[in-house]
Amino acid sequence: MKLSHLALVELLQKAYSAERAAAFAYIGHAGSLKAADAKMAVKKIEDDEWEHRENILRLMEQYEVPISRAYEVRFYVIGKIISASCYVIGRFMPFFFAGKLESGNVCEYFRMMQHFHSLGIREHDEMLYAMGMKEKEHEVYFLEQIKTDRLLPLFERLFSWGSGKTANDVNLENKIPVGNSDQYCKPSDERR
């Protein structure tokens, strides 16, 4: 079945390429860290990003969505630049910006689910839910690493993400079940 839902096609293409950029960034991030446990944690997050990319590719193949060459090139370059920069920008910024990025990524998967639902397709709910929750776990991990850093209040004000600010409405302590999770990541006027 070929998708004719342009917003969903674009979201799949962008997410597919952005997952590779994130994985590249985490290679540099892990490499720049000194503590073995932190290196392993970021490496695990990198592995999750590669797995998400594979899952998205399967969806794209199932619905005949072509890979966007433009996104692939753009996000390849972005990922490599971020990866290299991790070695020179200190400890705080890679954790902060990774957390901010993951915060936005959470909603990608719930928006995909909403778009699929608009087409009457629910067979991917479990996978999309799991990927959205995994991105939230990543966000929480990165914030935990910098929660006491003296730079956090300044960066939180400048970039609208941190201890009191997030780009999604997912709460790992009070998860909405998969069957109702299309409530996540809607504009506030659409939430019930």
Positions of PLM-derived features:
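Non-heme di-metal
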Residues: 1-192
